[in-house]
Amino acid sequence: SKLLPEVRKYLEEENAFTEENMRETKDLQKNLFKEIEGRIKLEDESLKFKDQRYEYWSKTTKEGNYTKYLRKKFGEDKVETYWDGDVEAKGKKFFNTGDIAVSNNDKILAYSIDDKGSEYFTIFVRNLSDGKIIEEPILETAGAVTWAYDDKSFFYSKLDKLHRPRQIFQH
C-alpha cells in the first residue's frame, strides 16, 4: 500500500470507532443493503455495436461480480467471451477494471486493471485467438487505452506522484 503509516493508523482507528458506534444498527444496515440491492438490475446486457467483422457487447449476471465482454462474428451464432472480469479477479483481494480495448483488426485485446486499490492501472496485451498475454505488462498507468488506426501500437498515459496523468506514451 502507498499509505503513510500514520495515515493508515488514523484510518484504522476511525474504522474501529465507527464499528463500535454503529454496532446497534447492524440489523438496519443489513435491511437497507437488501433493499438497495433489490433495486439494482443484476442481470443486464449492453446494446450491441458493430465493428469490422464482429458485433460487441457486455453483460452482467447475478452470479458474477464483474462484467463479461462478448462478441459474435457477423452471420454466425457462436458467442465468444473475450474478457471475463470474474475470471480475471479470481484470487485477488481487490480488483478494478480500467479499460477494455480490442484492436481495429479484432485480433488483440489491451486491457487495464488495478489489483491493489492504488488507482494505478497495469495494462496487459492479449492475443484473442489463443488468450495468451503477448507483451510485458505496463505498470502505473492511468488505465485508458486507445489503439492506433494501424493496429501496430496503442496510446496510454502514465500518472505522476500526485496521481495526475502526466505523459502520453505510444506502445
What are these regions (language model features)?
Residues 1-171:
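Beta-propeller folds
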